[in-house]
């Protein structure tokens, strides 16, 4: 991961993430108003710069203010390269964890982790600047590993991993991908239930 992103990590170069540039423009009036008039704890959730006005529930460069911070869990990781290398490393570690929980050989787990983390879509969304989307996708395997442990009656570690995965998904603030995670969890639950009934 560090080799792939070495220009960004070691040379200080920046990936020009187009959607981040656009988001800066879309949220500039809101951020200006926030800087001039906001009291502590106040945050505008409406932007007049997009489509003639629409909700703007995640601020420029920050999670929604009502969400707790989980920087103690993933803050060290995001220091590696928040907008590039850390996202891929998150996917590597989390998918490797899922494969280990599923009982896969370590070498196959490593291969699967690389396949997951370096999937073309993940690289495309990094270039586009969909940072929180990439993190939520990267944390999905933690939730799934927790589910697998819960179904194997390993309740303590299953609950810890499941709740940690859900918390990190919500804290990173990409509701669409979290919604897809909920649908995936429901499908897996139905599959386990059908298998259990048979």
Describe the residue ranges of each PLM region.
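Membrane-embedded helix bundles of polyisoprenyl
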Residues: 90-102, 106-195
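Membrane-interface coil-to-helix junctions
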Residues: 2-95, 114-141
């Amino acid at each position: 991961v560090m080799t792939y992103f070495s220009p960004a990590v070691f040379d200080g170069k920046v990936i020009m993430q187009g959607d981040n540039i656009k988001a800066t423009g879309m949220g500039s009036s809101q951020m200006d108003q926030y800087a001039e008039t906001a009291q502590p704890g106040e945050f505008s959730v409406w932007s007049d710069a997009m489509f003639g006005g629409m909700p703007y529930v995640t601020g420029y460069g920050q999670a929604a203010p009502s969400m707790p911070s989980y920087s103690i869990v993933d803050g060290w990781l995001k220091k590696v390269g928040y907008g590039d290398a850390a996202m891929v490393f998150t996917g590597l570690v989390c998918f490797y964890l899922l494969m280990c929980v599923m009982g896969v050989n370590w070498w196959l787990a490593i291969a699967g982790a690389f396949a997951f983390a370096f999937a073309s879509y993940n690289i495309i969304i990094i270039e586009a600047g969909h940072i929180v989307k990439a993190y939520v996708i990267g944390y999905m395997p933690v939730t799934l590993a927790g589910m697998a442990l819960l179904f194997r009656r390993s309740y303590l570690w299953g609950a810890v991993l499941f709740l940690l995965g859900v918390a990190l998904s919500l804290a990173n603030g990409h509701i669409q991908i979290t919604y897809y995670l909920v649908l995936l969890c429901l499908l897996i639950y139905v599959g386990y239930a059908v298998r259990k009934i048979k």
